[in-house]
């Protein structure tokens, strides 16, 4: 029987690649619901191609355009962030793919898990912001979470079938766009430079987060919540080739690693198909083309965001939510050429140093912390 999919953020990088998987396996998947933030043209085209039941545009200003573009079809059209969350909880889907970017992904994650859905999660911010709440809800509803992030998919695959305790998780890191750039030159980097990721093809925000290593810090937090591993047992290693996606070291000294070419369709396919694997077309990994795989420690002075994220995890509460909110504002400002690249982490530090803190947060506390962090970051950047 076909799996019925709701794809949240279908017009973004992960959403588009998820639909690539559907095209490769038309007998396995049925696209029921699609959502986008503003790109109504692509959303309409996707809804037509995959004969979706429902299309939702989060930005209500584009409702009319989407409705008109889908006139004459049977596609139901809705608008607004509440509608996105309602789609996530919809009763006629089996799997929710959360490919949204940022804090906006939290409410749909909560809605999907609350309805007991299988969640294929690319929106790491759901766990960065509200990991304790989200994992407790998933356990209560017995709703499985399958990570789409390549690093966490790799760890998940390494842990399948294992019952022994682990010594540590080893998350690999490409180093981002400025891996080989001296610290003294970081003050003058441009948006165009920051968007040139050396290995992965991703959306703009996550590519900037990769350049600051905010993304890697968030992945440490995500790994903690997904696998119940304390921050002291999570190691980040620089691995420029991006072939080893992550590793798990066990108590007996054995290490399992998951390898593959840098292609997000592999972890997406794994999340959708687990516990099976799909037969995928395309070029296979050639060991002869990669005779050398190298690893190194991360320069934490050059990339302070990694330690900031680890400290937020140690503090728990709303600390990571504050970091995320400030980062979202600062990255948008950088992409809009309203601040320097170095100002991104400075804005995060400013917000964390001034924000209020809730030790045992509710969903309402997360919302308040996000709003406060965004205000403080904007204050620092004079936006």
Please identify what each model-predicted range represents.
Residues 1-383:
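Catalytic, metal-anchored helix/loop core of enzyme active sites in primary metabolism
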């Amino acid at each position: 029987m076909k799996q019925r999919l709701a794809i949240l953020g279908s017009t973004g990088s992960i959403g588009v690649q998820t639909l690539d998987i559907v095209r490769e396996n038309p007998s396995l998947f049925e696209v029921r619901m699609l959502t986008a933030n503003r790109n109504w043209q692509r959303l309409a085209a996707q809804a037509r191609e995959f004969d979706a039941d429902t299309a939702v545009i989060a930005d209500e200003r584009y409702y009319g355009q989407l409705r008109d573009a889908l006139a004459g079809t049977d596609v139901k059209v809705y608008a607004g962030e509440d509608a996105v969350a309602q789609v996530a909880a919809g009763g006629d889907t089996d799997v929710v793919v959360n490919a949204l970017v940022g804090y906006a992904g939290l409410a749909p994650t909560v809605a999907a898990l609350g309805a007991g859905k299988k969640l294929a999660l690319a929106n790491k911010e759901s766990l960065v912001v509200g990991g304790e709440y989200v994992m407790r809800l998933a356990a209560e509803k017995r709703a499985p979470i399958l990570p789409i992030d390549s690093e966490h998919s790799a760890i998940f695959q390494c842990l399948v079938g294992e019952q022994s305790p682990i010594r540590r998780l080893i998350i690999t890191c490409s180093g981002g766009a400025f891996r080989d750039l001296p610290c003294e030159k970081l003050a003058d980097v441009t948006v165009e430079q920051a968007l040139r990721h050396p290995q992965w093809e991703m959306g703009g925000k996550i590519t900037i987060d990769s350049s600051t290593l905010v993304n890697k810090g968030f992945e440490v937090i995500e790994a903690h919540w997904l696998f119940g591993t304390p921050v002291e047992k999570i190691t980040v290693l620089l691995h420029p080739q991006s072939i080893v996606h992550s590793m798990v070291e066990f108590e007996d000294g054995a290490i399992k690693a998951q390898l593959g070419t840098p292609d997000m369709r592999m972890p997406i396919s794994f999340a959708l198909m687990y516990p099976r694997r799909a037969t995928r077309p395309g070029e296979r990994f050639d060991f002869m083309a990669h005779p050398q795989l190298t690893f190194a420690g991360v320069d934490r002075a050059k990339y302070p965001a990694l330690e900031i994220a680890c400290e937020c995890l140690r503090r728990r509460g709303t600390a990571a939510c504050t970091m995320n909110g400030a980062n979202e504002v600062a990255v948008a400002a950088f992409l809009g050429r309203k601040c320097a690249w170095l100002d991104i982490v400075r804005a995060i530090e400013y917000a964390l140093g001034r924000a209020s803190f809730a030790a045992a947060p509710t969903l309402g506390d997360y919302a308040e912390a996000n709003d406060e962090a965004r205000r403080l970051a904007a204050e620092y950047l004079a936006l």
